[in-house]
A protein has these predicted regions:
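Broad, structure-driven detector of short, well-ordered beta-strand segments within folded domains
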Residues: 42-44, 87-88, 145-148
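N-terminal beta-alpha supersecondary unit
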Residues: 2-82, 93
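ATP-dependent small-molecule kinase catalytic core of the GHMP/sugar-kinase superfamily
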Residues: 2-31, 118-173
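Short pre-catalytic strand/loop immediately N-terminal to key active-site residues, enriched for Gly-Thr
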Residues: 84-97
Length: 173
């Protein structure tokens, strides 16, 4: 049985410019996304049927609101796969704006691709990810990218962060 361990990295938006609000509730933006070392950890393996999800936090559930489960369902609808078990260790604060849920979804897409030897291209994974959330496409490749539209139009860059940086995330209110 294949077991896949993957880190699911956070991102920061550098120089975020909100251009306007769209009729669908999203905003058109221009930004630079930078992947950072802070990450969640996922262990993903095959199972006979369905998506079995567990986590080290009690606020994430194995339901249709969970982005990991949503990512699995998209792949199951498109490809001949059975099930997966997902164990998620959360290290990134929820609601922090660092994209942890989107990053987790992208990690599930990439892991299913490898575990089931699907050979789906990054471009196709990006297309699937865009149906899950605006930040998911960025996390398929990660690194440093210019993001436009709602964040789904991406152009890769060489890393722009040099030196050290400090991210302050307020605790839960």
């Amino acid at each position: 049985m294949k077991i896949f361990k993957i880190n699911s990295y956070a991102k920061v938006n550098m120089g975020l410019k909100i251009l306007n609000k769209r009729s669908d509730g999203y905003h058109n933006i221009s930004t630079i996304f930078q992947e950072i070392d802070l990450h969640d950890e996922l262990i993903i393996s095959k199972n006979i049927n369905g998506c079995q999800f567990s986590s080290n936090v009690n606020w994430l559930h194995n339901d249709q609101n969970n982005l990991c489960v949503i990512a699995y369902n998209h792949m199951k609808d498109l490809y001949d796969i059975k099930g997966i078990d997902i164990m998620l260790t959360k290290n990134i604060s929820r609601g922090s704006g660092l994209g942890s849920g989107s990053s987790n979804a992208a990690a599930v897409l990439k892991s299913i691709n490898k575990i089931y030897d699907l050979n789906v291209s990054d471009d196709d994974l990006i297309e699937i990810g865009s149906k899950i959330g605006a930040d998911v496409p960025f996390f398929i490749k990660g690194g440093t990218q210019i993001g436009e539209g709602i964040g789904e139009k991406l152009i890769g860059l060489k890393s722009v962060i040099k030196g050290r940086y400090l991210i302050i995330i307020p605790g839960p209110t």
